[in-house]
Amino acid sequence: MSNLRRAAEALRRSKTVVFFTGAGISADSGIPTFRDKLTGLWAKHDPQRLETADAFRANPTLVWSWYLWRRHQVSQAKPNSAHLSIPQLADAGWDVSVVTQNIDDLHERAGSSPVVHLHGSLMDVKCFGCHRPAELSPDQLAVPLEGQLIEPPRCTRCNGRLRPGVVWFRENLPDNAWRSAVRLVRACDLLVSVGTSGVVMPAAGIPDMALAVGATVIHVNLEDVGMDGADEIMLEGPAGVVLPALLQATGVAALSPPGVPT
């Protein structure tokens, strides 16, 4: 039996499915890679040096402007057929949830719910000082003109600077997000890991967490992730091709609207 048929059988037998997603699921959505498509002002900067609390303390205007630009790039991207396959499975009767390492909002725009963001979201803003979430107007979130830097807005409660609601390097995962992820994974009977690197802890331990409670794990990746468990199934290929094929093999129609990459 092929791995695709094995995966389809596992999906048919399941009731509660968690999709655990990483950068690979958004690869076909046109979100620019940092190094290949940086232009103008941002070509001078190493993105990893801008994604720390120390960088924000040293130059909050530069870091805030960088994230406004990133947010704009994400807003121009569209959910691809991999994102769209997940709510299609939910519509067909499965209990489906998403735990993602991505900071884009493509799962939400595809129609998935609930979505747990382990690393925060570019769409969220919080105070650097008191850590409370904040709401901003569209004007305050407008992308800066080329070469222009914008001072971050201030918190209405403590007057601290506002920052992106993402997890920076050397920061811990949000407690609420991690607890929600653990609860969902421990309650699932099938986990589909899509486009994850498998190296960033503690999130990299999520597939093993699912296996420990008796769930089957399907890995979707461009290359073999080196799994060795009897309850693991490897599907190699782009997520935008593999997930629709899995749904079709299971008997669920997985059609993409015009203009969506497949």
From Swiss-Prot:
One of its GO terms (cellular component) is cytoplasm. It catalyses: N(6)-acetyl-L-lysyl-[protein] + NAD(+) + H2O = 2''-O-acetyl-ADP-D-ribose + nicotinamide + L-lysyl-[protein]; N(6)-succinyl-L-lysyl-[protein] + NAD(+) + H2O = 2''-O-succinyl-ADP-D-ribose + nicotinamide + L-lysyl-[protein]. One of its GO terms (molecular function) is protein-malonyllysine demalonylase activity. Substrate binds at residues 67, 70. Binds 1 zinc ion per subunit. Zn(2+) binds at residues 127, 130, 155, 158. PROSITE patterns: SIRTUIN. The active site is at residue 119. SUPFAM superfamilies: DHS-like NAD/FAD-binding domain. Residues 1-262 form the Deacetylase sirtuin-type domain. InterPro entries: DHS-like_NAD/FAD-binding_dom, NAD-dep_sirtuin_deacylases, Sirtuin, Sirtuin_cat_small_dom_sf, Sirtuin_class_III, Ssirtuin_cat_dom. Keywords: Cytoplasm, Metal-binding, NAD, Transferase, Zinc. It is an enzyme of class 2 (transferase). It is found in: Cytoplasm. Its cofactor is Zn(2+). Pfam families: SIR2. NAD(+) binds at residues 22-42, 101-104, 195-197, 221-223, 239. CDD domains: SIRT5_Af1_CobB. Its main location: cytoplasm. Its EC number is 2.3.1.286. Signal peptide: none annotated. PANTHER family: NAD-DEPENDENT PROTEIN DEACYLASE SIRTUIN-5, MITOCHONDRIAL-RELATED (PTHR11085:SF10). 2 residues (Tyr-67 and Arg-70) present in a large hydrophobic pocket are probably involved in substrate specificity. They are important for desuccinylation activity, but dispensable for deacetylation activity. NAD-dependent lysine deacetylase and desuccinylase that specifically removes acetyl and succinyl groups on target proteins. Modulates the activities of several proteins which are inactive in their acylated form. NCBIfam families: PRK00481.1-3. This is NAD-dependent protein deacylase. The lineage of its organism: Bacteria, Pseudomonadati, Pseudomonadota, Gammaproteobacteria, Pseudomonadales.
